[in-house]
Structure formats: structure tokens, C-alpha cells
Amino acid sequence: MIIRTTVKSIQDIMRQDVGVDGDAQRISQLTWMFFLKIIDDQDHELELTKDGYRSPIPKAFQWRNWAADPEGITGEPLLNFINDELFPALKELKLTGKPGDRRRVVRDVFEDAYNYMKSGHLIRQVLNKINEIDFNNLDERRHFGEFYEQLLNDLQSAGNAGEYYTPRAVTSFMADRIDPHPGEILFDPACGTGGFITCAIRHMEKNYVRTPKQREKMHDALRAVEKKPLPHMLCVTNMLLHGIEDPSFVRHGNTLARPLISWCKDERVDIVLTNPPFGGREEDGIENNFPTFRTKETADLFLALIVRLLKPDGRAAVVLPDGSLFGEGIKTRLKEHLMEECNLHTIVRLPNSVFRPYASIGTNLLFFEKGAPTKDVWFYEHRVPVGQKAYSMTKPIRLEHFHDCMAWWGGKERKGRKETAHAWLVTADEIKARGYNLDIKNPHTIADDHGDPETLLADLVAAEAETVGLRDQLKAILSEALAR
């Protein structure tokens, strides 16, 4: 694929630059450059289709005026321009205060962006390669979008990237089960690189969006927040690639920084799709925003917030680690609160290998609806396909691996569910009697028969004796050979 080859060439050029150290910096560098090219290509189109349209970026800093000419500025002058003029200008863009102000998007992206490259000549080579991609060409944009997702997957090897990466198959499955419609307010309070939002967009485009009005309705109802600079920048760029003209709904900030009670009725949402960071701990003082559930554990605080944010009949799908299911103390109170305020109708239990290589931890997909309390909970155990020991980088989880669960689900009304080798039902009373411990194992699993212990011990002794005999034979052969 030409796009893949182009981006690989760019990465190879960056590896020659002494200032770029590792995957995370390389991807960050790539992203702000692609962002400016995508914005400029969109500007070209909007200038033709919208009367009076003006780019959010001042003329001197528009891609077309400093980066597009292959024979343009290079070397030390280019490096100085980027560091001393371009970045300061974009970090301090003045906002118009009008709705849909794309200047906010640009300023937020560059707020914590950084130019890692030290060679102006290598920067020029990268710019010229990027110019080979036309983001107004739908076919090229689609191919680049596919490659961009692979680029996000590459973040798995970039340190603590697991905090904001969820496998595409998992996000697609959750979006499909939640079934968002255009106009329903959909929120991801810890959006990372935007995987849940893009899967929700694809789901709505495939099933419901038929007119420009419906598309506008879908876009206007999206909400997202990301705390860290790199995933925020990646998310905004991801939205642009998905044809969203104004991704200012992706805010850069900490959703947990507000007191829980300050979220009022007009901020409630219809849908929450999210994967709060595993094992994250918030800074001092954040727990004071949650007086009833005072803890520094990020996943717990997000769960409390989600219950608060949902409208009556609102629905959520949330990824949580096993620790949230069996934990005690604050976690127990939180699960009791969840089951009193919401119908926790389904928990899909995933194997430890789904989030490898950066996390080997049991995870769960919780599906619940605000309103009626929980009467019973269906559990579904997702297993690694037969013939495969675990999911991995080379054999990751795919959407087709969820097809059995989707067939069992019972449609929108969840009708006709039956207990199977993978599925079992637990009443709310049973869960309450367990102290709200939701770490309930599959009762249909048959324990592996390892055989009679005495027979196994005898076999072990015989095997060890055979090993000793072989070792003695080898010693004798070696001694004889050395004596010659």
C-alpha cells in the first residue's frame, strides 16, 4: 500500500534524527505534522464549499505557505521557524468565542505538543513525504485512516500506552451492543485516542446516517475528554480523519477534577462508552470531589461519575479490571450503589491476554442502564478460540471472536437468553449475600483432570531416574572421548 510505504519512509527518516527517542516521541512528532496537513487540506475544501470561510490558522503558519513547497525553507531556518515562530503562534491562538471555533482545536492540540526533531534538513524530507498524501482524496484518506489505526496499535510498545489503548475488536463489540443513534448524547470521559468514539461513528454511519442532517445531528451529540497530551492530539487527528470538521468536542482536561455534585441535569448523557485507565491513581485532592466514594483509584472514581452522568434510561458499556469486581471497602459501596441506581444486566468476562503485551490482567465489560435497580446479572465468559493458547500481538482478538456472544445476546431486548457452557445467571440477592463480590466464576467449567496423584508421582520418579541414567551415559561417552 502506497500510504503504508510513505509513512514507513517518514519513520525511517525520523530515526536518523538525534532528537527523536523512541516510539512515543516519533508518533507524537508524526501526529502534529499530519494534523497541520489534514487541517490545511480541509481548509482548501471548505474555502470552496463555504462562503466566507477562513482558516483557523494565521496565513504565515498555514501548511501551504511554509511546508508544501518541496524546494522551500529547509535546514536551520526551517528549524528556527518551527521552534521560534510556528509553535508559539499556535499555542497562543486567540479564540473568536463563536460556536465551532476551529482555533480552539488547534490551540488545544499544540498546548503540549513539542518538536523533537533537531535537523531542519530531515524535517524538510519528512514534510515532502507528507505532501504525497492528499487528505481530500477519500480513497487515500480511508487508507490512511486504516494505517493510522495500526499506528495507534503500535503504541502498545510505547511504554504506558495501555492507559489509552483498547483493542479495536473490544470497542467495536461494545459500540454494537450499545447501539447509539444520531442525536443521542454519547460521552467518553477518558477517551484516549478516540477508539470508542470512532467505532460509534462507524456504527451510526453504517446503520442510521443517511442524510447530511443526520450526520450533523450525530456530530453535535459527541462528547469526549482526555487528560494526557499525546492521546488527546491523536484523538483529535483521528476525528479529523473521520470527516469531523470541528472536533472541539474532544476536550483536553481531567473529567474527575470537578466535584461529583457539580454535574447538573443539563449535562447528563444518553450513552457512556469508556475504558478508564487500569490501576491509575489520581493526584492528591481529586478524591475530595467524591466524598461518598473517597479513593484515589481512577477506575472507581470514573464508575461513580458514570452513574451520576447517565440520564434516566441512559446506558453504558465500561471496561473494568477484575480488581473492581472483587475489591472490598469503597469498591463494595460503589458496586452496591451501581446496582441500586442501574440495571447491571450483563458482564462479559475477558481472558487475561486481551490487553497484552502491556497488561496481562483479567478484564470485564460491564453493560448497565440507569433507572431500575438490578434484579439479576447475566455473566458471559469469552474464551480464547480453540487451538489458540492466548491472544497476542500476532494473534489479537478480533470482532468475529465475539460472534457467539452476539448470537446469544438476544437482540435489543435481550430476549431468549439461556444458560450455556459460556453463560450463567446470578440474582441480585445472591450477589448481595456475597458482599457484592462480582468476581463470579463460570459454574459450568469442568476442572481439568490431571490424573491420580500417586500415579503422577510414580511417573515423575521414573522420569527422573531415566534422566539420571541418560546423564551418566553421556558422562561416560565424553570421558571415553577425552581419554583418546
Model region roles, listed by residue range:
Residues 26, 174, 229-232, 296-368:
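Conserved Class I SAM-dependent methyltransferase catalytic core
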Residues 258-261, 279-282, 326-329, 356-359, ...:
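Switch/connector loops and helix/strand junctions flanking conserved nucleotide-binding motifs
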Residues 1-182, 247-257, 349-354, 374-383, ...:
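Non-catalytic, mostly N-terminal accessory regions of nucleic-acid modification and defense proteins
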Residues 163-274, 279-281, 287-289, 296, ...:
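Conserved S-adenosyl-L-methionine
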Residues 17-21, 283-298, 322-330, 351-358, ...:
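Short, contiguous acidic/charged loop-to-helix segments that flank catalytic cores in large enzymes
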Residues 343-344, 356-403:
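C-terminal, active-site-flanking charged/polar segments
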